[in-house]
């Protein structure tokens, strides 16, 4: 399907202060943009914006960024935000970026993003385009460059072939592990808890299409293999409280993991 160009999109986005025009300049400093040091969640391919705007309103303790590649698509989400703004209901903890997902590492620093949402992404059905799918291992490598060690990727779709492909990619991934999945989200009492539907989700669900969802996380054992095999570390493993690419917070055996510690370490 050919994307319809909307001539006024560029001017509307340019005038909206919530649209970040030079996102690369904020790499590593996104908390300065939001004025609050809070976890950062992003949605890649935010569509009309209902999902992320609802999340932002419900969770003021989290900062959100909606990403779209095309200005004519991002326009719809920005206009929805502006409607809420006119009513005095717009969440303050949301920003928008018009960019290609391939450029994520130039916009976000390592361990700067806590969660990535992928909702009803383009399935790119032709086999030769598999690398373009947002749930391909090519993209999981990019996500690994920006996610915290406890970061997650959440993916929803009604496209079963795409979902099966995504599961297979995770099963062969060297960086992520599959934590949860459902082939019928709306009838899954556990995974559907707190679910916020996108516009597409509501449409496809009303047509009787089951919605699939998976949650994946970084495989920390691959990040610090020595830590998980050293007998002394394993003996005191219950005291290990947090690991990511930059920090290890621990007690009782900080001397043992000194080689892994880089900065801002806190003993519990």
What is each model feature region?
Residues 79-110:
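S-adenosyl-L-methionine
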Residues 1-39, 61, 178-268:
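SAM/dcSAM-binding transferase cores
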Residues 150-157:
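Conserved beta-strand signature within the Rossmann-like core of class I S-adenosyl-L-methionine
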Residues 135-149:
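A short glycine-rich, Lys/Arg-flanked "PGG" loop and its adjoining helix->strand segment in the class I
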Residues 44-47:
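Class I SAM-dependent methyltransferase "Motif I" SAM/SAH-binding loop
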Residues 49-53:
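Glycine-rich SAM-binding Motif I of class I
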Residues 106-115, 120:
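A short acidic, Gly/Pro-enriched loop at the edge of an enzyme's catalytic core
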Residues 70:
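Conserved SAM/SAH-binding beta-strand->alpha-helix loop
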């Amino acid at each position: 399907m050919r994307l319809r160009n909307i001539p006024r999109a560029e001017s509307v986005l340019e005038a909206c202060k919530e649209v970040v025009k030079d996102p690369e300049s904020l790499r590593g400093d996104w908390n300065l943009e939001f004025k609050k040091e809070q976890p950062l969640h992003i949605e890649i391919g935010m569509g009309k914006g209902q999902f992320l705007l609802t999340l932002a309103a419900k969770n003021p303790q989290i900062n959100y960024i909606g990403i779209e590649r095309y200005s004519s698509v991002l326009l719809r989400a920005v206009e929805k935000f502006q409607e809420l703004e006119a009513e005095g209901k717009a969440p303050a903890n949301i920003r928008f970026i018009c960019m290609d997902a391939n450029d994520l590492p130039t916009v976000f620093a390592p361990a700067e993003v806590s969660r990535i949402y992928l909702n009803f992404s383009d399935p790119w059905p032709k086999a030769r385009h598999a690398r373009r799918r947002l749930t391909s291992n090519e993209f999981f490598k990019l996500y690994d460059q920006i996610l915290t060690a406890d970061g997650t990727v959440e993916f929803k779709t009604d496209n079963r072939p795409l979902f099966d492909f995504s599961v297979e990619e995770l099963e062969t991934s060297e960086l992520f592990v599959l934590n949860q999945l459902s082939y019928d989200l709306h009838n899954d009492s556990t995974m559907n808890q707190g679910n916020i539907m996108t516009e597409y989700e509501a449409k496809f669900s009303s047509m009787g299409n089951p919605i699939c969802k998976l949650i994946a996380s970084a495989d920390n054992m691959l990040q610090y293999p020595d830590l998980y095999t050293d007998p002394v570390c394993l003996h005191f493993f219950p005291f290990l409280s947090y690991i990511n690419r930059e920090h290890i917070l621990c007690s009782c055996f900080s001397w043992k993991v000194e080689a892994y510690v880089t900065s801002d370490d806190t003993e519990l």
